[in-house]
Amino acid sequence: MKGIIYKSTGSWYLVKAEDGTYYNARLRGKFKHLDLKVTNPLSVGDFVDMNIDPLTPTEAMIFNIEPRTNYIIRRSSHKTAFGHLIACNIDQSILLVTLKQPKTSIGFIDRFLISCEAFRIPAVIVFNKSDLYNEALMEEYLYLKDVYEPLGYRCILTSMEKENGLDELMPLLQNKISVVSGHSGVGKSTLINKIFPQLDIKTDIISDHSQKGKHTTTFAEMYDLNETSKVIDTPGIKELGLFEIENDVLSHYFPEMRSLMGQCRFHNCKHTNEPGCRVKEYVEAFKIAPTRYESYCSIIFEKDTHR
C-alpha cells in the first residue's frame, strides 16, 4: 500500500494512504536513502510503501521510500556531519520573517533561500507582524522587497493579528504542497490557525527577556487545505546551517551571481579577493545588494575556517 508521510515524531510516522485512511507506521529496520547522511531517514512529504499490521489494523510497517523530487535540508544541530530533513517533495516554500519581536537576520533569510535554490524550489518571503512596523521598519521592508523581488522571490507584507495580507497569500497556496518555515515566534502556527481555524494549534510565545520565540510546534506536520493543496507546518529553526553545499558552487545558488557565470577573469573565481571578478564589480556598482554579498562572504569564510 502506498501513502505519504503527514507527521514524523522520530520513530513513529503518521501516514495517509491513497484511500484517505491514516496509519501509525514505523520504518522497518535500519534504512538508508540514497546514501544521504541524515538524522531522520523519513520526512513529512515522503511517499512510501507500507504493509498493514494484520494484528493491529491501524498500524503499518514502511518498507520502501520513493525517490524524492526535492527536499529542504539543514545541518543537524547535534551531529554536524549529518543533515536534518525539513520537508520533501514540495512545490514551494513560504518563509515567514519578522523585522521585530523577534528580528529575522538577513543572513538567515539568505541561507534559507540557498537551500531552496539547491533544488529549484520557488520561495515566497512573508514579512509578518506589520502591525508593529514604524516608519523605519517599513523602509527596511521596502528595501528588502526591492532586493529580493527582482531575484524572483515574491514578498508579501502581512499581519496575522490584523489579518492583513492573507488575501494575497492564500491564492498562492492553491494546488501546491507548501512548507512554512522560519524562526520560532514569527507566526507560523498563527498562520496555520488562520488557514485551518478548526485545528486551534498552540501559538508561539515571545520571551520578554530575549525577544526570541519559544518552540510550540515540536514536529513537522502536513495539513490538507483541500483535495489538491497541502500545507506543512514546521518547528521553529534557531540556526540554519547549510548542508552539502560547497564553496565552489555556492554562487550558483545566488541568482544575481549565477547570471554572471563565466564572466570573471579566472574560471574558479571565489568572488572574494580575486582580480578581475565580475561579481565584485557588480557589488561595487550596487548592481548586487551589499547585504547579499555580505551573506555570501560570511558563508564562504565560515566554511573555510571549519575545514
Swiss-Prot record:
What biological process terms from GO does the record include? ribosomal small subunit biogenesis
Under InterPro entries, the record lists:
G_CP_dom, NA-bd_OB-fold, P-loop_NTPase, Ribosome_biogen_GTPase_RsgA, RsgA_GTPase_dom, RsgA_N
- As recorded in UniProt, coiled-coil segments are none
Q: Which Gene3D superfamilies match?
A: Nucleic acid-binding proteins, P-loop containing nucleotide triphosphate hydrolases, Probable gtpase engc, domain 3
EC number(s) given by UniProt: 3.6.1.-
Question: Which HAMAP family does the entry link to?
Answer: GTPase_RsgA
Q: What is this protein called?
A: Small ribosomal subunit biogenesis GTPase RsgA
* Lineage, opening ranks: Bacteria, Pseudomonadati, Bacteroidota, Cytophagia, Cytophagales
